[in-house]
């Protein structure tokens, strides 16, 4: 079994890199990509820890690209996490994210809540602050009963949804990841909120920038979406990947490492091996 889209507490996941790797091994996962949001700070620790383990650890990252409709997240697999230009861009993204978080705090406090930056830093343990950290505070203060309430009632509505986090468009994100030798994958394509024909046009555009693949198996996809995305990937000569988008049982309840939601991303062993072999072949050629 494999999982090519996961998060640690380096961003908004719950487990340390070591804990995530141990969990993967306990589930007989043979290839694991760590793809934290907008940061590669956990990768070095993960790579060192995995060296003595029976698992292929794939250095990765997930970066959001600025678009007008929906959300576009782009994965970089086998990324050179020491690349100077990548790290420079990630610093700019962190500043934009910090600015967004301050605006979130301001808007929440206007509504009568009491949220501080110090609280966010505490629950994030000094790592990248994301929306799940706001949810933790809201749960702690009993402003909400379930984590999803903060997304449904606030983050997905005005003015919160209009507050931008990212500063780079798809072309710049893909270019930066390619320069860091990453294999570039469009994560959970359903987040773009496009019909199949519109999605095809968008993929044609992204392919011109250097897109390598499509995440065709994701925990939040229906069977039909998986089939549609797989067909689109094959039509445009893109590699196919699978990822649970695992964060942990409290952050994303019901999503399991390697198997997704109710085993919805469990595939034949041969198909998963083929995915990894293709990634290894591309990665080998890029680093030669």
Name every feature range the model reports, one short phrase each.
Residues 51-204, 263-288:
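Extended substrate/RNA-proximal surfaces in nucleic-acid metabolism proteins
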Residues 1-70, 154-157, 168, 172-251:
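An N-terminally biased module of ancient metal coordination in phosphate/nucleic-acid-related enzymes
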Residues 253-267:
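Conserved, well-ordered active-site substructure
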């Amino acid at each position: 079994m494999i999982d090519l889209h996961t998060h640690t507490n380096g961003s908004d996941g719950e487990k340390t890199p070591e804990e995530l790797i141990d969990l993967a091994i306990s589930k007989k996962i043979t290839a694991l990509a760590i793809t934290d949001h907008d940061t590669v700070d956990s990768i070095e620790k993960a790579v060192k820890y995995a060296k003595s383990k029976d698992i292929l650890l794939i250095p990765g990252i997930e970066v959001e690209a600025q678009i007008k409709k929906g959300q576009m997240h782009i994965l970089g697999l086998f990324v050179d996490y020491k690349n100077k230009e990548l790290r420079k861009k990630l610093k700019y993204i962190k500043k934009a994210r910090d600015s967004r978080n301050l605006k979130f705090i301001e808007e929440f406090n206007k509504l009568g809540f009491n949220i501080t930056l110090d609280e966010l830093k505490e629950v994030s343990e000094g790592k990248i602050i994301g929306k799940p950290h706001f949810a933790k505070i809201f749960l702690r203060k009993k402003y909400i009963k379930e984590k999803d309430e903060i997304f449904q009632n606030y983050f997905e509505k005005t003015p919160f949804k209009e507050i931008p986090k990212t500063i780079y468009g798809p072309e710049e994100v893909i270019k930066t990841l390619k320069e860091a030798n990453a294999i570039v994958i469009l994560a959970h394509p359903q987040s773009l909120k496009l019909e199949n024909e519109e999605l095809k046009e968008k993929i044609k555009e992204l392919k011109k920038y250097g897109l390598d693949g499509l995440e065709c198996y994701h925990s939040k996809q229906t069977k039909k979406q998986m089939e549609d995305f797989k067909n689109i990937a094959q039509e445009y000569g893109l590699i196919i990947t699978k990822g649970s988008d695992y964060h942990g049982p409290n952050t994303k309840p019901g999503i399991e490492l390697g198997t997704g939601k109710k085993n919805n991303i469990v595939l034949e062993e041969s198909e998963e091996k083929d995915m990894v072999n293709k990634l290894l072949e591309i990665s080998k050629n890029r680093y030669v």
